[in-house]
């Protein structure tokens, strides 16, 4: 990518920093995660959680959600201006699970947001530490990506549910900043833009007045983020057209859907980061690990190392398979929901199965679920190898793929052929090549049709032994190419509903 030099690294976005060298980046990311860890330890003390209860992923998620809610200024303002029955705008809380007389019991807790903000700042040297908050948002987003399929959301915006491999980060809040934008998939950006254009079509005043000016700036910014994800000139030129449109409407929606489809073959650059639950950082800090001194990276060996010796528990419903629950959380930790299952399986060292074959529901427990029969189990989050997380979509290779998900978005920088069926994708491109973007559309279709297998395999580094922290001896795995690689293949995963 020609523009590489102007880009800040993901870690810089993550820590809100300007240009830094590798050591400074490692230190500032280390500072960020140790702040999360210190906060978690303090919250466990406040709530008087036992060691076991503090390692429960459901408790971790509740505590993470509380701090995110405490710092959600827009929602806090909204709640204060629109007081709703039974919601105290100044308080936040959620379910905390405790072990009592050999059973798990749910206790609903409430805290002042001000108090939570104080504890968070205190754990982060008095700063707001927005980067740490974004980090938690990305972990929740990665968990959603692994747990739910966004079929309904895709259909609502007029996109094809088979494009789910482009939907990384679709549940990230708008306020997640540059680090959040980096991990959003092409489909996610397209969906946000289509929603915006549809509002403009239905509401005459959407683009008008002082508010409309702000809306327009947001629209152009989102267009630029999406443009930056594309790697070919024609795709970027089409994004310029969409961005410069005087009055965005159906033509722009068509263009965006076309671009999303094209991204199944001409993949966008989407960042992947291993964001772990707060309790994992808490455990490490409590054991005396100094993240800031040692440095930390979200895209290297560090998260694998951390998970190698962290014991995290999860509540398990009566008919769920603990191994499947572990797979779900492992995928979320490494942001691997859209990775080729063969690559994930090789790295993890145990077979990673498609979503439809998992006997497990989401990690969070609804408030109306009966706690009587709940059990808890250790999550198996260790891996056999580690690999560098990628920020590019790579190029693609004509392989057979399935009716479920017709492409993957590589997470790990590992050399492989990419599974998808060219015929399936090209079938989506019949019809409309007229209009002001016709030459670009023709060019994009030509590139997709002429892509040769070697152009479109993913050139990566390979995987590494966990003892090889400097990544000196890449192991290039060989895969059975007849095997299905998609996670949401022919699937019945639950929908994500806000």
UniProtKB/Swiss-Prot annotation:
Ribonucleoprotein is among the record's keywords: yes
GO molecular function: RNA binding; structural molecule activity
Record-linked Pfam families: Flu_NP (PF00506)
Localization per Swiss-Prot or TrEMBL: Virion; Host nucleus
Region (Disordered): 1-21
Alphabetical UniProt keywords: Capsid protein, Helical capsid protein, Host nucleus, Host-virus interaction, Ribonucleoprotein, RNA-binding, Viral nucleoprotein, Viral penetration into host nucleus, Virion, Virus entry into host cell
Motif interval(s): Unconventional nuclear localization signal: 1-18
UniProt main location, coarse: virion
Record's GO cellular component terms: helical viral capsid; host cell; host cell nucleus; ribonucleoprotein complex; viral nucleocapsid
Post-translational modifications: Late in virus-infected cells, may be cleaved from a 56-kDa protein to a 53-kDa protein by a cellular caspase. This cleavage might be a marker for the onset of apoptosis in infected cells or have a specific function in virus host interaction.
Motif (Bipartite nuclear localization signal): 198-216
Self-association and partners: Homomultimerizes to form the nucleocapsid. May bind host exportin-1/XPO1. Binds to viral genomic RNA. Protein-RNA contacts are mediated by a combination of electrostatic interactions between positively charged residues and the phosphate backbone and planar interactions between aromatic side chains and bases.
Job of this protein: Encapsidates the negative strand viral RNA, protecting it from nucleases. The encapsidated genomic RNA is termed the ribonucleoprotein (RNP) and serves as template for transcription and replication. The RNP needs to be localized in the host nucleus to start an infectious cycle, but is too large to diffuse through the nuclear pore complex. NP comprises at least 2 nuclear localization signals that are responsible for the active RNP import into the nucleus through cellular importin alpha/beta pathway.
Entry similarity comment: Belongs to the influenza viruses nucleoprotein family.
HAMAP family the record matches: INFV_NCAP
Name of the protein: Nucleoprotein
Native source organism of the sequence: Influenza A virus (strain A/Chicken/Hong Kong/YU22/2002 H5N1 genotype Z)
Gene giving rise to this polypeptide: NP
């Amino acid at each position: 990518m020609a523009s590489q030099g102007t880009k800040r690294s993901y870690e810089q976005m993550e820590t809100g920093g300007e240009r830094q060298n590798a050591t400074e980046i490692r230190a500032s990311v280390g500072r960020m995660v140790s702040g999360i860890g210190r906060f978690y330890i303090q919250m466990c003390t406040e709530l008087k959680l036992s060691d076991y209860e503090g390692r429960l992923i459901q408790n971790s998620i509740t505590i993470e959600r509380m701090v995110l809610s405490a710092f959600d200024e827009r929602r806090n303002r909204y709640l204060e201006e629109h007081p709703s029955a039974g919601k105290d705008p100044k308080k936040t809380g959620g379910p905390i699970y405790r072990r009592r007389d050999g059973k798990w019991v749910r206790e609903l807790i409430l805290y002042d947001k001000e108090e939570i903000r104080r504890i968070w700042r205190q754990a982060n040297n008095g700063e707001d530490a927005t980067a740490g908050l974004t980090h938690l948002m990305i972990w929740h987003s990665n968990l959603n990506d692994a747990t739910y399929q966004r079929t309904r959301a895709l259909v609502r915006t007029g996109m094809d549910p088979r494009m789910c491999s482009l939907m990384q980060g679709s549940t990230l809040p708008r306020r997640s900043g540059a680090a959040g934008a980096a991990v959003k998939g092409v489909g996610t950006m397209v969906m946000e833009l289509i929603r915006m254009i549809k509002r403009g079509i239905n509401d005459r005043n959407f683009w008008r007045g002082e508010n409309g000016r702000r809306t327009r700036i947001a629209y152009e910014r989102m267009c630029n983020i999406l443009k930056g994800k594309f790697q070919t000139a024609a795709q970027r030129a089409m994004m310029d057209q969409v961005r410069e449109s005087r009055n965005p409407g159906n033509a722009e929606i068509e263009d965006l859907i076309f671009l999303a489809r094209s991204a199944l073959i001409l993949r966008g650059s989407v960042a992947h980061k291993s964001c772990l639950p707060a309790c994992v950082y808490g455990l490490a800090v409590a054991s005396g690990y100094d993240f800031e001194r040692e440095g930390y990276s979200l895209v290297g060996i560090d998260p694998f190392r951390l998970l190698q010796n962290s014991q995290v528990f999860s509540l398990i419903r009566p008919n769920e398979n603990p191994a499947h629950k572990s797979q779900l959380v492992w995928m979320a930790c490494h942001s691997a929901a859209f990775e080729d299952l063969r690559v994930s399986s090789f790295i993890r060292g145990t077979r990673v199965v498609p979503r439809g074959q998992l006997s497990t529901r989401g990690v969070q427990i609804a408030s109306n679920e009966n706690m009587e029969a709940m059990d808890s189990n250790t999550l198996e989050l260790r891996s056999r190898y580690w690999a560098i997380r990628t920020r590019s979509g790579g190029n693609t290779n004509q392989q057979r793929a399935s009716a479920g998900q017709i492409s993957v978005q590589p997470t790990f920088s590992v050399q492989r052929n990419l599974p998808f069926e060219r015929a399936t994708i090209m079938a989506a491109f019949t019809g409309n090549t007229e209009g002001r973007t016709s030459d670009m559309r023709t060019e994009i279709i030509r590139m997709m049709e002429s892509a040769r297998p070697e152009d479109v395999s993913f050139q990566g580094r390979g995987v590494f032994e966990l003892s090889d922290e400097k990544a000196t001896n890449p192991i290039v795995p060989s895969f059975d190419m007849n095997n299905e690689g998609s996670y949401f293949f022919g699937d019945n995963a639950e929908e994500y509903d806000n």
